[in-house]
C-alpha cells in the first residue's frame, strides 16, 4: 500500500470523525416544520441529542438541556449511545492507524504494520455504521411522523442540519476505512522460496562426448 493512499484514507476517516463530533453536539437534529398554522409562527424550535433551542424572530436564542433521558423519543435515546460509542471507537481507530502508519517507527515489521492498518480500517468502518444507524433511524421517524395525519401540525418536525452532517461523517469514515483496509502485507513475506532443480545430464556412447564416466577419473 502506498503512503499516499494510506494518508488519504486516514485523513478522510479523521474528517469523518470530526464531523461525527459536530453531529453529536449540534442541536439541530429536528427543526420546526412550517406547515399549516405554524407558517406564521414567531419562533423556531431546534432539537438535538443533548438540548433543545428556541430561536425567536428577533434572533434571540434560548437553549435548555433535557431534564431527563426518558423524556427523549426512542430514536434520540439510542442515538445518544450509538454516536458516543462511534466517536470513541473512531478515536481508538485513529490511535491504531498512527501505530501502523508507514511514517512512524512504533512497529518496524512491514507485515505487522499492514495488519495494524487493516485493523484501524475495520474500526473506522464500524464507527461509520454506528453513526449511520441512528441518523437514518431519526430521519425515518421524522418523515413518518410528518406524513402521519394523527400527529398534530405543531409537533411535526423536519430534518435538521445535524442529520446531514451525520450522513457526511458516515460516508467519509466508510471511504477512509475502506482505503485503509486495502493495505496488504508485502507479498515477498509470504512467497515460498523457489528452489531450482536441474536434472543430471547423462552422456552416452552415441553422443560423441565420451562414456558415462569421464576419462580423467581413471589413472
UniProtKB/Swiss-Prot annotation:
Any one GO molecular function term: cell-cell adhesion mediator activity
Residue intervals annotated with topology Extracellular: 30-80, 137-159
TM segment ranges: 9-29, 81-101, 116-136, 160-180
GO cellular component terms listed in the entry, alphabetical order: apicolateral plasma membrane; bicellular tight junction; cell-cell junction; lateral plasma membrane; membrane; plasma membrane; protein-containing complex; tight junction
Tissue/organ expression: Expressed in the lung. Expressed at high levels in the liver and at lower levels, in kidney and testis.
KW tRNA processing (keyword) present: no
Phosphotyrosine carried by residues: 197
GO biological process, one term: regulation of transepithelial transport
Residue ranges annotated as Cytoplasmic topological domain: 1-8, 102-115, 181-219
Location of the protein in the cell: Cell junction, Tight junction; Cell membrane
Coiled-coil region: none
Pfam assignment, any one: PMP22_Claudin
UniProt superkingdom: Eukaryota
InterPro entries named in the record: Claudin, Claudin3, Claudin_CS, PMP22/EMP/MP20/Claudin
Family: Belongs to the claudin family.
Oligomeric and partner information: Can form homo- and heteropolymers with other CLDN. Homopolymers interact with CLDN1 and CLDN2 homopolymers. Interacts in cis (within the same plasma membrane) with CLDN19. Directly interacts with TJP1/ZO-1, TJP2/ZO-2 and TJP3/ZO-3. (Microbial infection) Interacts with Clostridium perfringens enterotoxin CPE; the interaction may disrupt claudin assembly in tight junctions.
Protein name: Claudin-3
Gene behind the chain: Cldn3
